[in-house]
Amino acid sequence: MMAYMNPGPHYSVNALALSGPNVDLMHQAVPYSSAPRKQRRERTTFTRSQLEELEALFAKTQYPDVYAREEVALKINLPESRVQVWFKNRRAKCRQQRQQQKQQQQPPGAQTKARPAKRKAGTSPRPSTDVCTDPLGISDSYSPSLPGPSGSPTTAVATVSIWSPASEAPLPEAQRAGLVASGPSLTSAPYAMTYAPASAFCSSPSAYASPSSYFSGLDPYLSPMVPQLGGPALSPLSGPSVGPSLAQSPTSLSGQSYSTYSPVDSLEFKDPTGTWKFTYNPMDPLDYKDQSAWKFQIL
């Protein structure tokens, strides 16, 4: 108990006890003193007789075991650790002397050339043709083969590009005449595939005389398979195997079961003046026409 009461170095507890020589160390402006350095070991000075004994053992072996070091330490009256350090320093000095002797024996020009030659001997030169192989086996010169044109030029374009209604314009007159020339018919096609100008769809009611001309203006939008077919096989109204129903004239078709179509026919009112006049009465959907019969139930 009295050991804690002995006066010693005054320490501060929560900065309350500020007496003693170390009070200045608590102030922030005063730098703390570094830890005391470890006292260096005194440099050992060997006598001539000690050096002779150590050199004699070093001539026998540069790495003596602990027993040989202890025996020499007893002879020269030194600790065994000092003998061990002396042998360590002596081996380093011996290596340095040998390097200096090698440098003196070689000319200055050979010394500068010896280092690159030594570096090249350690590493094998990499051939210029060494190319890292691809683990997937695909070389740099690989390029996927594009599908070639199997039929007409329009077929190749259709396989590469995406179909768009705006990209399909009506063909010129000369090319259209070549398409109608000959070829198998397409009677099994869902729509008639003739290239008629778009004005035939909106110009006059006579353009709706037959089903083939009725769908002619919608071909660029209803038949995306048109550019994928051969050139001379696009007209169903010509060729040797055309059916009699499709080979007839528009007038004969209209005489059978297809009458001339008019935009007014689709409307309920035949009177042109009253076509776009719709009389709507908001009271019609109501069940009770009389307003007095209206009853609202509060939910």
From Swiss-Prot:
The keyword Nucleus applies. Keywords: Activator, Developmental protein, Differentiation, DNA-binding, Homeobox, Neurogenesis, Nucleus, Sensory transduction, Transcription, Transcription regulation, Vision. Residues 39-98 bind DNA. Transcription factor that binds and transactivates the sequence 5'-TAATC[CA]-3' which is found upstream of several photoreceptor-specific genes, including the opsin genes. Acts synergistically with other transcription factors, such as NRL, RORB and RAX, to regulate photoreceptor cell-specific gene transcription. Essential for the maintenance of mammalian photoreceptors. This is Cone-rod homeobox protein. Residues 248-258 have a biased composition (Polar residues). Retina. The gene is Crx. Its main location: nucleus. Gene3D superfamilies: Homeodomain-like (1.10.10.60). Pfam families: Homeodomain, TF_Otx. It comes from the Eukaryota. Interacts (via the homeobox) with NRL (via the leucine-zipper domain). Interacts with PDC, RAX2, RORB and SCA7. Belongs to the paired homeobox family. It comes from Mus musculus (Mouse). GO terms for biological process: cell differentiation; circadian rhythm; nervous system development; positive regulation of photoreceptor cell differentiation; positive regulation of transcription by RNA polymerase II; regulation of DNA-templated transcription; retina development in camera-type eye; visual perception. It is found in: Nucleus. Residues 94-155, 236-258 are annotated as: Disordered. Residues 97-106, 139-153, 236-247 have a biased composition (Low complexity). InterPro entries: HD, Homeobox_CS, Homeodomain-like_sf, Otx_TF_C. One of its GO terms (molecular function) is DNA-binding transcription factor activity.
